[in-house]
């Protein structure tokens, strides 16, 4: 019994040490808020994570997130009574929806100073309320805290909802969504 326990402990310790992160591995957890600009009005609250590797001062990785969006319905009609099966959207003041962005991520990070500039580019696909392609570009400042870092980034984000993917009851969400906002990221 002691021998089996010893072998099990050695196997567990070996497995844990073999999964240790390499020096070039980086992970980011980002929280952000954006406001829609252009033909759509509303806001979006987001939380995402990206993981990948550093190649010199450039991070290359991928990520996933979750966003809660509120879009004002410009076609809202007070006390609207639905006539057809799918025209009830006219009686809704605000659409609330969840998006799940899946993206590739490239960041430029200059690590030789306590405070340094950064850039961030994301491209991918949105699943949820705004189903379609997405792109995001941002620039900001990184604060080195030793083994970890914080960064603040101002961004512009675009998501495209194709008309053919939209059902009749959510006609307002078709077309381009563009938002401006601020993200704060924790780097590990």
Predicted regions, residues:
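Bacterial Sec-dependent N-terminal signal peptides
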Residues: 1-25, 184, 188
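Residues that line or immediately flank small-molecule/substrate-binding pockets and catalytic motifs
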Residues: 8, 32-33, 66
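Short glycine/proline- and aromatic-enriched beta-strand/turn motifs that initiate or cap beta-hairpins
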Residues: 19-55, 59, 164, 187
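Residues that define the transmembrane beta-barrel architecture of outer-membrane proteins
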Residues: 23-27, 41-45, 96-102, 115, ...
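Extracytoplasmic loops and strand-loop junctions of Gram-negative outer membrane beta-barrel proteins
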Residues: 30-34, 86-90, 121-123, 164-167
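Feature marks short, surface-exposed loop/turn motifs that line or immediately flank catalytic pockets
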Residues: 35-37, 68-70, 125-127, 158-164
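Gram-negative (and chloroplast) outer-membrane scaffold detector with strong preference
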Residues: 49-152
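A generic hydrophobic-segment detector
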Residues: 132-188
